[in-house]
Amino acid sequence: MGEIRRLQIGNVTLENNLILAPMAGVTDLPFRLLCKEQGAGLLCMEMVSAKAILYKNRNTEDLLTIDKRENPVSLQLFGSDPDIMSEIAKQIEDRPFDILDINMGCPVPKVVNNGDGSALMKNPKLAGEIIEKTARAISKPVTVKIRKGFDEEHVNAVEMAHIAQESGAVAVAVHGRTRSQFYSGKADWDIIRQVKEAVSIPVIGNGDILTAADVIAMQKQTGCDGFMIARGAEGNPWIFAQILHYFKTGEELPKPTFEEVTQMILRHARMQLEFKGEYTGIREIRKHAAWYTSGYRNSSKLRGRINEVETYEQLEALFQEVCGDMV
């Protein structure tokens, strides 16, 4: 059986090795707090551009907001200029995050076309310079998130993990897909095993963790030290509690009832409104509500109605109306 245990990342001790992955547009403060309540051992923030912080882009402040209830929390920076990355790391070090993560895995074209994210998988030398300068600039632990490679012709996760370790990173997270795969197809867990066998720093496996059984299978196949959960948490912050319960008791928790799902959606919505105001908060909760209700009877019809909601009261009324039709 896989192992849920404490994990040491530099000078930071995680109570367990279940980690909420950084997801742009998903892992904002309200969602992170919900995952923390369900037992996540580490929360990763949405990625933020080092250049955006440098140029004082007003949209970055929400991305940098941390609540003391979250800790430990990992702040993820992306960029491809070693000087800017290290300078921004110094500027933000006093903020209450525990770990600084460097994004070398984002596959989104506008990020890659700027030489950032997974574009750095094609430039290991530059990647090493970024890690080294950033790790030297701050006292907080620095980690790196990478992919299997840029494409199937350039699979270099082992090389990148070596470089990360030699450059001062204290852990590496490996997504078992190439950049060209984006999020399609099956994650290659064997590349995680290869990285684990090649480096001495903790290796965190990422890709296709949807259940406790997946954690067991990944640990057995790869020997990885931690488990990073991404899409498995979308609409399902309970996944952390479900996995922890299974490892503690050997039994699966029952799936939340639709009433419990509804209460979570409404609570999540209230948190979004408090954090971002009604206009933005309601628009943010729409996608979450679609994920929460996915798989239920009439969920596709409900999704269309969710997207028309403009206020919290409308959202609450909608779920009161449809409750009986969904189960």
Stretches with model-predicted labels:
Residues 1-6, 10-14, 18, 24, ...:
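Alpha/beta catalytic cores of nucleotide-metabolism and tRNA/nucleoside-modifying enzymes
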Residues 23, 48-50, 78-80, 105-107, ...:
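Active-site beta-loop-alpha junctions enriched in small/polar residues
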Residues 7-19, 51-72, 106, 110-114, ...:
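N-terminal small/glycine-rich loop or linker at the start of catalytic domains
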